[in-house]
Amino acid sequence: CIPAANPCRGNARCCGNYVCKNGRCLPRS
C-alpha cells in the first residue's frame, strides 16, 4: 500500500484509512 501523504494515481491503494485524492493519499473523511 502507499503511505499517507505520498503521491498516488487513480484508485491506488493507500495504507490505513486513506484514499487516493488529488494525486495524494489523504485521510478518508
Curated annotation (Swiss-Prot):
Organism: Platymeris biguttatus
Intrachain disulfide bonds: 1-15, 8-20, 14-25
Tissue spec. comment: Expressed by the venom gland.
Protein family membership: Belongs to the venom Ptu1-like knottin family.
Transmembrane intervals: none
Keyword annotations from UniProtKB, A to Z: Calcium channel impairing toxin, Disulfide bond, Ion channel impairing toxin, Knottin, Neurotoxin, Secreted, Toxin, Voltage-gated calcium channel impairing toxin
Localisation: Secreted
Domain comment in the entry: The presence of a 'disulfide through disulfide knot' structurally defines this protein as a knottin.
Reported function: Binds reversibly and blocks P/Q-type voltage-gated calcium channels (Cav).
Organism domain of life: Eukaryota
A GO molecular-function descriptor: toxin activity
Name this polypeptide is given: U-reduvitoxin-Pbi1a
Cellular component annotations (GO), alphabetically ordered: extracellular region
